[in-house]
């Protein structure tokens, strides 16, 4: 993993390190002078190496596609579900925020909490007058630098009809004629 220059004493990394695999190393470095064998002196020092994480991992959703059902007529703010992604980077490189990535996000009657990933309804949705299915692209973005890494999942929300409308008689006037003796 490491090498040391015998001339300068400079410590070098021999191959790339990955903070997700191992983030700390403890080395013992020993210097020996060039005196005759019986007169040589040496000194040792313990060197601790902390590997600083870089933003080298994308967030990963537990599921990349999911379909759920949501009852019509639920009030605004009703919880739909929570999406969850993980990022194996550490610190801000692994801290995630969520958003709806659809271009028409303003028209979608759902919102996602940027911190928790909880999806909620923005308004009451009516099966008879609104769309019956919504396709959301949910994005998880890390807070990494120099650039953010992201991943998306597709969430399909199908609206379920509930029994909220009375039956209606289509013909209000009905004339019945009976001849005597038929009843």
Residue map of PLM features:
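Extracellular cadherin-type adhesion modules in metazoan precursor proteins
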Residues: 1-183
